[in-house]
Every structure is written in structure tokens, then in C-alpha cells.
Amino acid sequence: MDSVSLSEVTVIKGTTHLGFMHSFRQPFCGVKISPKFYLSKVDGPKAISSSSNTKSQFVYGGGSIAATSDSGYKMNGVNLKSRTLMSSAVKERSLLDAYDDEYGGVIVDHGKLPSNPYAFASMLRASLSDWRRKGKKGVWLKLPVEQSELVPIAIKEGFEYHHAEKGYVMLTYWIPEEEPSMLPANASHQVGVGGFVLNQHKEVLVVQEKYCAPSITGLWKLPTGFINESEEIFSGAVREVKEETGVDTEFSEVIAFRHAHNVAFEKSDLFFICMLRPLSDKIIIDALEIKAAKWMPLAEFVEQPMIRGDKMFKRVIEICEARLSHRYCGLSPHRLVSTFDGKPSSLYYNVVDDDHDPSHSNCSTEFYR
């Protein structure tokens, strides 16, 4: 008998589809099939069957296989004594590895996903049935970019996009059909910072961006940027100023923040304006991002037509001047630990006067030391 390439055969248990690229001199040597398998006609290794019957006959690229009365198998009319139709090196798993979350749902272990798309499809369906039977709620499925071919399979099973990062896409599935989904939505905001760096000569550190909208070409503006993941607002402001201008600074306080909507890809934006004390004055620009940077007299800065006509920025300047003359007090970070999660976090607030600990009061602190 001619050898049979297992790349021509699709075997399904539940809805598992296995395609192999190896040929054997003896047909299906070292391979077995369970009577629980139900089989389908295929048109190559990528064929997928959605059949749910339990017929014991299937067709491969060069012929057909049928169950015999003695629980053996027959191919093209020839009895196969071997009852093996799956490589012993490939041990089938029926469910995806997952662990429970705090809210009655499950999180799939993305480090243990099967590499075979057919196996993934079968295990995903079986897992959904198992989780539904156990009364689970939401399912979180993180698919690394290296296994992006699994994304359309999950989408076909009813998963939805939640968010994506550089190395993965996160999908979700809400199991209870009679209940609205309680899974939290993707992050709705981006967080930016601007560094208002003022020296003792009342000069403000400003930059001209290398790439900007034509309407603001030539505008001198504050160094700005986005907060990185797990980065504090105050450290992000110091970092952005250093990266763009080379000037070292010390965080003083958040003097104001702006909340705007539909800023980028329909996301909202939180922009924190931070007053920073300069610790150096030498400017070394980031040539990839910044066209120019300099120390500019505050009076000259606010007289720029675009700045002068901007009511919001005019108010920011007024707040900064009020802070310098002790008529205003911004928000300073205080590290505290909450019993809810046991983790330290930054709570921003101001203290006008603390008789027990004068150093605790940020409002009485001179901006220039």
C-alpha cells in the first residue's frame, strides 16, 4: 500500500482539527483514533469541519477510512489492525489552561496556548462549555503577536476586542447570555504632562517641536509628553523636560490639569501642568523631536499671538504667578498605602498650614530655594 501523508488527514475530537506534515511508510503507523472521534471530509490541512455527528467514516486526500465491526479501521477496503490514528508524541488536551479571577471569571494562561490553530479551536469551544457549566462570568484571553493566527478563531467563537498593546491583543467573552456584560471597558483616557520650568530670572524653558501642525509652526511652547506605563505624574514631567531639553529639574507641584474629550482616536485626555524648579540651565535638545529650545522671558512668552489669544493658557500663567506670590497653592504627591489593595500610591493634595509638622505644608514653601 502507498504511504499516506498525514497532512492530508483532519481528525476531529469535539472540534479539534489536527494537521501533520509527516509521511509514514506504514499507513498511520503509531497513530490511533478513539471511537469518540467524529470525522469529516477535508480539502487539505487547513480544512475545518463544524459537523457534530458521530459518523465513523471520513475522507482524506487519497481515499476513505471506515470503522470495522471489531473496532478496527478499514482504508479503501483494507483492514487496519492498528487502532492508532494520533501520533503518540501529540497528546491531546481538551481544555485551555486558565485560572479564576476575583470576579467570578477566568483568565486564560497565554503562556500555555496550543500552537496548533485546530487544537486551539477545539479546546476553546470545550473550555467555553466547561466554564458555562461552572457558572463562570467573563473570560480574558490574551493572544501574543506570535500567535496572531488564533485571533480570527476566537472572534468567530464570539470573543470581542478589548485592547491591544505592542506585543499582544486582549480579547474578552461574557458568558451569561441573560445578563449584561460587567467586564470593564478599555482605558478611556490618555495622560499627558507639561513642565512649567521657571528660573530666578523669571525665564521660562520653552521648545519648538520639530513635527507639529502647520498652525503652530514657530510657536514656543512648554515641554510636554505622555506618562509611561506605571510612571508617576511628577516623575513623568521631570523626565519629559530632561529628554527634550537636557535640563535637570525638581518637581514642585501640580498647578492645574485639563480634561478634554475626543482628543486622539475618540479617547479623552488628562493633561497635568506641573511647576518644576530648574537644577541646571544648560540646554541640550533632543534633535529627533525638538527643533529648538531656550530660556525665554515670561513676559515675552505670554505675548506670542497664539498664547495671548488662548484663555485657558492665560489662566495657567495667572495661576503660576499667583503661586510665586503665595496667593495660590498647587497639589503635591503624598505616598500612602490603602488597605483595599495594600499597595502604595500617590495622593495629590495641598496643606496650607500644619502646626504639628510645618514641613508637611507645601503652600508655605518658597518656590525658589
From Swiss-Prot:
The keyword Metal-binding applies. Induction: Circadian regulation with a peak after 8 hours of light. Induced by abscisic acid (ABA). Down-regulated by salicylic acid (SA). A motif (Nudix box) lies at residues 225-246. Mg(2+) binds at E240, E244. One of its GO terms (biological process) is response to wounding. Its cofactor is Mg(2+); Mn(2+). Probably mediates the hydrolysis of some nucleoside diphosphate derivatives. May be involved in plant immunity and act as a positive regulator of defense response through salicylic acid (SA) signaling. This is Nudix hydrolase 8. It comes from Arabidopsis thaliana (Mouse-ear cress). The lineage of its organism: Eukaryota, Viridiplantae, Streptophyta, Embryophyta, Tracheophyta. The gene is NUDT8.
